[in-house]
Amino acid sequence: MRCRRTGFLLVLTLLLALPAPASASTAGETIRLGPAKAGLRQLLSGPGERHVVRRAAGVRVRPGRATRRRSLAYFAQLSDPHVLDEASPARMEFLAGAGRAASHGYRPQEALTTQVLDSMVRAVNRHGVSGLRARGGRRAKLDFSVTTGDLSDNAQLNEARWYMRALEGGVLEPASGKPISAANPCHGATPEQVDRLNRAALERRYTGVQDHSDYPGAPSGAYMRFWDPDTGRAAGRYSRVRFPGLMDRAQQPFVAEGLRTPWYSVMGNHDQQRQGILSRPHAVLDRVSSGCQKTFPGIFDARTLAGRSAGSIFTSLAGARTLDVLRRDRRLVPPDPDRRVLSKRELRDMHAGPDRSHGLGLVSQSQNQRSAGAASYYAWSPRPGVRFISLDTVAEGGGPHGNVDHPQYRWLSSELRRNSSRKRPQLVVIFSHHPLRGLHSRVPDERMGPCSPRRPAQCDADPRRSTPVHSGLGGRQPLRALLLRHPSVVAMVSGHSHQNHVEPFARADGRGAFWQVVTASHIDFPQQSRLLQLMDNRDGTLSLYGTALDHAAPTPAPRAGTDASAFSSLQLASLSRTLSTPRKGSAIGSRGRRGDRNVELLVRDPRRLGG
């Protein structure tokens, strides 16, 4: 893993990032799990899956709609890429033994998130024309793409820059760690150590838990939770699986294709909070995240924290006794000031852009003014007759679960009332990171504490009172009840849960329903996105088609034992998908049932309900 990188290798890297082959949707071809071979679960091509027809309450299915229907909107949903800096001191992989609450602190495929996102972008681009035909054989062009949150994993500046490059296109450099300088110090390092760290940074070498030579002398058990692809050393399923040079290869630049459509961004909890849960400053994480000291697995026993909540675990890390143990497990790594947490204003500005094509530039002037620039919800109509509304469901007071604060709830209610009062109301599709069942945080935004010049990030920038906060299903004035009051709402499209799931929410008076569509993540199996198309069947019903989309990387991954130093970015993405597969015999619930993947979701056309 200590191979030097030359200009020749950079050129080779760029040449190997070739355009992806045409990517079939899962309606034409699926990926199925095969047997394990040489320690890796094999992935095989399988037959496509037809769209399962599902009806909301009160819908009569009439034959012949395929010859009558008209496309109203065709768009792609990408969710939960979790682009991450796997070398960051803020990753805290040493907590891997703390149980379920810390289970996402390490994944064997986590160094490959930028390549997976690029591979997914390539797949979306291959579907610029719909595979579904409307009346007269017409096929719609892709109107836009939407990212429903958790583009980054740890709310870091460098992670945000990486996903922006993946979505916009151009040369993407996924390595972190910069040479030591007066502006990027490593206090206490000897001249020899400074020289070693600077060489590692300049040569884009990986430093972290997946290179066991980076923390020699640790107790033998400390290495077993973390797969080292150079040696194949690890406990469990990837023991003896080798891909020499993989971790260094993952740090090398490649050419990202970039989306060919406008794309709109929805806020997720990992985009704004460390580990997706920490909204306030943390005594340990904030001090070490940009510096040159990383806590590696060692004498600290994370099993002592098993059974605790994630919040309790992170609180305990600031205790004097725990800090003393953690200091003894620290090793030097190249520092990087770009590992700092982004402020919400910075995040908004990155996505606003002069053309406002990424959504956050579409926040209304009144909401901008009242929120002091903190509002991150907006509405737009790229096609006549359909209104899209993007919500910010991040519970800024902390925690992984979402809510809708009261100012946003009032704005949404006003948007829906205004639409309902039109002579011909537009159909409404809601986008959010959290699905309704994930909106149950009762924590107010004020828990973060106010922003100040000395504290521009990890603070409550909105001067308005957030309470009462609104849940998805329970409590007073839940979001479901608000959406059901307006028949024009036909769908809510979300992510967060890392699994495919579809369910209807019907109105008690029988006046239609709306569909909740939840799509899997890019970081965990099956690493899918979704193509969505809203159709007017011209018989009093609408169809929302959802088609699961695999990313463009080859289905079979490179063979175990192959030298990874010359892998293309698509081969890296293919290997990521294979590494993310569930254990043999374990459930694959993240794929969902047949009725959660490729679906035709029928609902009564609210424009024809009358009065």
Task: Give the role of each language-model region.
Residues 25-136, 143-146, 187-247, 254, ...:
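Metal-dependent phosphoesterase/phosphodiesterase active-site architecture
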Residues 2-24:
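Secretory targeting and sorting signals
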